[in-house]
Swiss-Prot record:
One of its GO terms (biological process) is translation. It is found in: Plastid, Chloroplast. Signal peptide: none annotated. It comes from Chaetosphaeridium globosum. This is Large ribosomal subunit protein bL32c.
Length: 58
């Protein structure tokens, strides 16, 4: 016979939610830092094509 699980307390729920949010904040900060590095051109770990646009004025 199936027995219902006990309800998770509010404190445990809030703790798990806070851990999840803090991990997401860390990942977002890391992504922002990486984007700044790539845009500044100081990144050594990525290779990407630089497209130069030439303006033709006649």
């Amino acid at each position: 016979m199936a027995v219902p699980k006990k309800r998770t307390s509010r404190s445990k729920t809030r703790i798990k939610k806070q851990i999840w949010k803090s991990q997401a904040d860390k990942m977002a900060l890391k992504a922002l830092s990486l984007a700044k590095s790539v845009l500044s051109g100081k990144s050594k770990s990525f290779s990407y094509d630089v497209v130069e646009k030439s303006i033709d004025t006649n």
